[in-house]
Amino acid sequence: MTPWNLVGMARVKGLDVIALTDHNTARNTPEAMAAGEAYGVQVIPGMEITSREEVHILGYFSSVPEALAAGEAVYAHLPQVQNQPALFGNQIIIGADDSPSGTLEKLLINATDLSVEEVCALVRAFGGVPVPAHINRGSNGMIGALGLMPFLPDYPVVEVYPGVPCPAYATKGRFVIHSSDAHRLEDIQERIFSLDTHPTARDVMRLLRALDGRQIPQNGI
């Protein structure tokens, strides 16, 4: 699933704003942004970071430079375990015209040596918004990995996996987002929610950042 294929399918599905969140890297965000410009889809640069507890934390950023800088920091915290293409496939960096321009050597599906709290702090240090991913999913969700949804530190925004029960306490007092968590083109879902205001990626990031600080914008998005 290349950036251009991903954004093209999002266009077909009628999605206006999407986020690209590869595991533990943001190296493909530049081409995703280029594809978004071409297809008329707003793209939020990001990544899905694996903590040492095997919890997935989404990091959303306002710009490609922020995402790339955060991605380099995350990559440095991965163990020195090389990818085995025969088992896991090539970890390709996509360049211009959707063509391969390189590969990433470390195995990206590994956990970093950062705790959940440290991952969130790193994302915020680079200007991003951390969001615990699919908290209600058995694998790599916060509830499944930790046995509960912690109240501290504060997680103002959480992502819930659709179609799977989620304990009410886990989302109480929190802002909830949903995603298709697509790893294949056919997994990309059609939109569930729509807004009359036609928000841009910048608008969505402004709202997420406000929610992360538990500030409700007076004029909404």
Predicted segments, located by residue:
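Charged catalytic cores and adjacent phosphate/nucleic-acid-binding surfaces used
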Residues: 1-15, 26-68, 107-108, 121, ...
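Conserved Rossmann-like nucleotide-binding pocket used by diverse enzymes
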Residues: 19
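Active-site gating loops and adjacent loop-to-helix segments of metal-dependent hydrolytic enzymes
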Residues: 62-104, 148
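Alpha-helix-centered segments that form part of catalytic cores
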Residues: 90-126
